[in-house]
Amino acid sequence: MLVRNILEESVQKFGEVKAVKWLKKKEISERSYYEIMENAASVRKGLLAEGFEGKHIALIGTSSVEWIESYLGIITGCTTAVPLDAALPCEDLVDLINRSDCAALFLSPKHRPYLEVFLANCPGLQKVWMLQEEVEDVPEKVYSINELRNIGNNASKDAACPDAEDIATIIFTSGTTGKSKGVMLTQKNLASNVEAVKISAEPGTVMLSVLPIHHAFCLVMDWLKGFSQGATLCINDSLLHMVRNMSIFKPDIMLMVPMMIETIYKRLAASDPAIPKQVLAEKVFGGKLHTIFTGGAHLDPYYIEYFAQYGIQILEGYGMSECSPVISNNTPENNKPGSIGKPLENVEVRFENEEIL
């Protein structure tokens, strides 16, 4: 099973289900599984028609429906996606584009000021697609995402399905010494992690995606795992708006790092104790949140017990980008606060001096 197979199966099962929701001018916009995968296929076919088969393609931007459709278009064809941290300084992004040998770039409108710098200092870049419907007054080599989609829609040939050992994505992680390192993950790496995490959700289950989209945890467990279940993924436009967006989208499930959980705890702890917990949960969480998956750092078990008062189960796990990324996790049926759960069925874990290697 490859990522493309998982997504095509999702379209067959959940075609009319709302796959993505986001805020646009204070109104909720949405697209179905059929629409998302149709746009992803247009990107995939467009890249093939433009001669980018086998190339590395960078993406820079915060979470957006255009970003995720482009990412899916890249990894479902014979191309490799290189998602980069949109918060990095321009010179660092130039370095990563060059080090990862990227031939093209998808760029968010917010990063338009970096465009000329990229074109001048990244000699390997052949084309840049802005993640917006139309562009004006742009340099040569720069186009809108719609122009690429139109090329794909008019193309007679689709990209071949990649092989299991083909590199699907390169994730840059913070290096312990010196520069960040690029972790190469294959099609098999991504698909096997999606399948091995035994967490099920009903089609239409609402998930609010709040983690940085260039992280493996967000990409694989929010988006790919969520799509495999027929979930509705809601885009958080800013961490500053997370609590507001929880009340707007009313998620059932969320992925968070411990720092986010601790921030919400402080808000709850500072609330008037006379307010009933059910009322407070409605105000802070939207009233439907029942599960939070967490990883990336240790979480004090106190928070797990505290959130349980509001009917929210926190499931802690452990992983790293090199493992695509989940290694172990607690489940709703087997949740032990203070632990990182059981290893996935396709993972072997070695201990030395009471530490996981």
PLM segments and residue spans:
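Short beta-strand->loop structural element characteristic of the AMP-binding/adenylate-forming
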Residues: 58-60, 67, 71, 75-106, ...
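Structural core segment of the AMP-binding/adenylate-forming
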Residues: 6, 76-147
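Flexible, low-complexity linker/hinge segments
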Residues: 1, 116, 136-167
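Conserved AMP-binding/adenylate-forming core of the ANL superfamily
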Residues: 20-64, 68, 72, 89-94, ...
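Conserved AMP-binding A3 loop
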Residues: 30-34, 168-194
